[in-house]
Amino acid sequence: MIKNNVFSKAAITGLLLIAVSLWMMAAGKVATSEIWMPDGFKVPILALEFGSSVAEIQKIVISISANANANILFATQIDMLFAVIYSLFLFFALRAIYTITNLNQYKWLALLPILIMAADIAENFQIVNALGNFEINLWVLKIATWIKWLGLAVAFTAVGRFLITTGRYFDKVLALSTYVTIPLGVWAMFAHNGINEVFAMLFYLLFPLTIIYAWFPGVKKKG
């Protein structure tokens, strides 16, 4: 099955991505009831990523217990590895689409995950600084955060643009789901409430669905 699969590299990387994702979620699991977060936020790490000011970020960090801080810090460090793996997954997926379609736009879009990875790592460094009570650069955090999230939206929309051309129902549902990401991301960029988490959580759905597609694409390798 995997031998003739044009998405084989993405499929295998996807399994590693799932494993690291589960590790990261387990490591960062904390009781959130005592953590102060802005209205609409329920996930501490997302509240930190989308922090609107240094004072707000510091208020969140101060409310986090020492044990919870250690867990979130460890999960953030794992996220450095996670960023590399999901970027590889997207790179392999977009390269596979380029192989199938021979459209140059996918050849160049396959480079987008490199920018996303760099932004995610820069964002994580700022969060590590915040958790360690070191100085943070709010503009670096904001710019890196939105390059990452909007970059993911563009990457998945590009995948969706290919999937909409196939005949399978699953592919079309996945494609339509990716089309929501850019408008939702633009809305979230100018908001500071629950819509930020809805936007981020959408990718928790899109990644596993795209991994499933990578394993069962219905497209065989040529030659």
Please name every model-derived segment.
Residues 4-40:
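N-terminal signal-anchor transmembrane alpha helix
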Residues 19-23, 114-122, 179-190:
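Aromatic-anchored segments of alpha-helical transmembrane domains
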Residues 30-73:
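Extracytosolic (periplasmic/ER-lumenal) interhelical loops and adjacent juxtamembrane/interface segments
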Residues 73-88, 140-154:
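Membrane-interface loop-to-helix entry segments
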Residues 80-99, 155-169:
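Transmembrane alpha-helical segments in integral membrane proteins
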Residues 94-95, 100-117:
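Interfacial segments of alpha-helical transmembrane regions
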Residues 125-140:
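Interfacial helix-loop-helix junctions of multi-pass membrane proteins
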Residues 152-223:
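Terminal transmembrane helical module of multi-pass membrane proteins
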